[in-house]
């Protein structure tokens, strides 16, 4: 009887050991999975950083002046095209934004926004547009880069400004051979161009690239913020023009949403930017068409977002031909290389971030 009792006791001990072993095994398994997931995420971030700066290791590489990306020596100061691109719902999806070096988004009239997208002529883009009419402030921004302005007509003030200030432009009204009209789109949302056509204009007229005044750029080699500003929302007071930028920590960039959907260009490429600037500017309505006058020189408030955080600062443009620069706590902002997207808003705009 005592032997049976001892066997039962020993059997209970083994059950306890067994259950404890099982518990320990699953606990270790859970921690291992957690560790591997965390390690994988960090590895992805590091790989992304390596990919973004790997060109730096090649011989004779230098930063492209328009966006800070490393390119072969001799390609840093190519001619730049500043293309006025439609953003009406009937024009979407637009072509070219996913490959742009720099984009300004600003109201054209009546809370309807339009893009001024900058492209270095070393890019091979088969289709860019729809191309629309220009506004005076677009002319000012194009001049900052000595860019060739690409547009289809414009407001009276803008066309007069182009003529008076002798801004180099390719107006579709007088240069139709460098554009085409798509049969599947209705006017005025059907005018497109390509970098091949624009470069043929450049070559035909024996143009020379002028020096670009560059911003400062850095390599992405620091710790990335994870909690400060994952979403930036700009509400242009129209459901069709509500913009959100959501921070992607894996790639250290901002994914664009338009009307609450991921914004993709006509080639199904997501619109992603390395730097987001919200630039508050003095604005007034000047005519019955609700066109605007935007003061592009002087200084004002700005919100500068990169590496997962937004910082309040100021923008300054000391003259009509100088480059707009951005400052936080008195120091000029050093941007990540890649696409910078400038959201131009009225002074009283409220930005959620």
Residue map of PLM features:
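Sec-dependent signal peptide cleavage junction
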Residues: 30-48
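Hydrophobic membrane-insertion alpha-helices, especially the h-region
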Residues: 18-35
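A surface/extracellular/periplasmic glyco- and lipid-processing/surface-interacting theme
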Residues: 27, 47-102, 109-353
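N-terminal Lys/Arg-rich, disordered targeting/topogenic segments
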Residues: 1-23
């Amino acid at each position: 009887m005592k032997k049976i009792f001892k066997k039962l006791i020993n059997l209970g001990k083994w059950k306890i050991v067994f259950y404890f072993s099982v518990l320990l095994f699953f606990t270790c398994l859970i921690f291992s999975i957690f560790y591997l997931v965390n390690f994988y995420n960090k590895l992805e971030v590091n790989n992304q950083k390596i990919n973004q700066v790997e060109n730096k290791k090649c011989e004779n590489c230098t930063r492209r002046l328009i966006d800070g990306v490393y390119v072969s020596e001799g390609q840093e100061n190519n001619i730049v095209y500043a293309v006025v691109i439609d953003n009406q719902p009937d024009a979407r999806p637009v072509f070219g934004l996913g490959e742009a070096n720099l984009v300004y988004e600003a109201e054209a009239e009546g809370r309807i926004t339009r893009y001024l997208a900058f492209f270095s002529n070393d890019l091979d883009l088969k289709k860019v547009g729809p191309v629309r009419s220009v506004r005076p402030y677009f002319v000012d921004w194009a001049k900052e880069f000595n860019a060739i302005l690409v547009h289809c007509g414009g407001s009276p003030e803008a066309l007069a400004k182009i003529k008076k200030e002798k801004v180099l432009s390719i107006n579709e009204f007088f240069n139709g051979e460098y554009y085409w009209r798509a049969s599947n789109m209705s006017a005025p949302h059907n005018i497109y161009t390509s970098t091949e056509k624009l470069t043929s204009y450049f070559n035909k007229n024996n143009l020379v690239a002028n020096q670009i005044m560059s911003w400062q750029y850095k390599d992405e080699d620091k710790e990335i913020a994870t909690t400060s500003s994952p979403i930036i929302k700009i509400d242009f007071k129209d459901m069709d023009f509500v913009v959100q930028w959501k921070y992607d920590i894996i790639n250290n960039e901002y994914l664009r949403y338009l009307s609450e959907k991921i914004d993709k260009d006509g080639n199904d490429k997501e619109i992603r930017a390395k730097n987001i600037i919200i630039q508050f500017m003095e604005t007034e309505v000047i005519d019955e068409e609700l066109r605007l006058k935007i003061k592009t020189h002087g200084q004002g408030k700005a919100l500068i977002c990169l590496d997962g955080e937004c910082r309040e600062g100021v923008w300054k443009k000391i003259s009509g031909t100088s480059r707009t620069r951005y400052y936080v706590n008195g120091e000029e902002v050093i941007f990540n290389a890649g696409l910078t997207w400038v959201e131009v808003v009225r002074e009283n705009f409220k930005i959620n971030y």
